[in-house]
Amino acid sequence: IGFLESYLHGGITTSISASEVHVPGRPSDPDGVVALAVAAKKSFDNYSPGGMHVHAGAIILEPGLTQKHFNEAARQGVWLAKAGFGKFKSPYDYKPYVKMAQKAGMIVNVHTGGASIPDSSPITGDHLLHMQPDVSFHINGGPVAMPDADFPRIINESKIALQICQAGNIRTALMCLDMAIEADEFDRLIFATDTPTGTGVMPLGMIKTVVEMACLSKHSPEMMIAAATGNNANVYKLNTGFLKRGRAADVILADAPLGSSATTALDAIKHGDYPAIAAAFTDGVPRYVGRSRNT
C-alpha cells in the first residue's frame, strides 16, 4: 500500500500497468476479464497517488474473448492488453487475440522469457515473431531471459518495442541494449521496472536501470534517460517524456548526490551513483521540493 507514491519519490512520474494479474480471485472468464480491466482503468482515472499518472486496466488475454469484448473494453477507455498470463495450451494460440486487441486500438504487451505464474508458459522469440505484439515486456527476462539467439531476431525481424526491465537479467539487458543501438533501433528501446514482483518493491527501479545501463555500457546517460522517458512516451502514445511546448509538465530536478565524486547528475549516472532527486512536478504542480524521501 502506498508504493506508487514512493515510486514518485524515485523520480517516476508515470506508471503503466502490466495488468491486474495478481488481484485475489482474479476472474478469467471473458466478461470478468473485461470488467476487471475497466474497473482498474476507471479507479485510477479518479486516483493519482502523490500526483503520479497511473495508466491502469490492461485486459488479460484469455481463451474465449471475442472482438466484441475488446471493442467494449476499448469503448470504456481500456487501451492496454497483456499476453502471457492466459490459460492457453501454447503461446502460439495468443495470435488471434493479439490481433483482436490491436484492431480495437489497444497496445499489446507480451510477457517474455520464462513462465512467471501457474498455468502460463515460457515465451520465446519464435512466439513473439508469430504474435507480433507492440511491446516485448521485460525482453531481458522477467526474471528469466529467453535464449540469447532470439534477441537479434526480434531486433532485426520485427518492429516490436524492446522493454528492458530492472527486475530481469542484467547481462541480457546490456546485450540487448548494445544490439539495438548497433542496429540503429534505439527508438524501440524502453526502460521499465517490472515491479513490484518477487524481486521486490523498487521505488528507485527506473533510475537504477538508467544508471546501470549507462555505467556498465559505452552509451551516454542522455541516451539512457531518453529510453526511460521519450521512447516510452512514443511507444505508448503518451503526451509526456519531452520538454516541449504542449507536452505534460511532468519534470524532475536532479543533481549529483551528496558525497559523490561527480559534480552533476549526468556525471553521477555515468559513474554509477544514483542522482539526488530534488523535486518532482506533475501537471506543473510541485509534488515535493527540496528532497525526495528515497534519494
What spans do the regions from the language model cover?
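Charged helix-capping and loop-helix junction motifs
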Residues: 1-2, 32-39, 95-99, 121-125, ...
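Active-site core of metal-dependent hydrolases
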Residues: 78-200, 217
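Short coil/turn connectors at secondary-structure junctions
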Residues: 12-13, 47-54, 76-78, 104, ...
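C-terminal cap of metal-dependent C-N hydrolases
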Residues: 249-295
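His/Asp/Glu-enriched, well-ordered alpha-helical/loop segment
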Residues: 178-257
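Alpha-helical scaffold segments that flank or form the walls of functional sites
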Residues: 1-52, 61-76
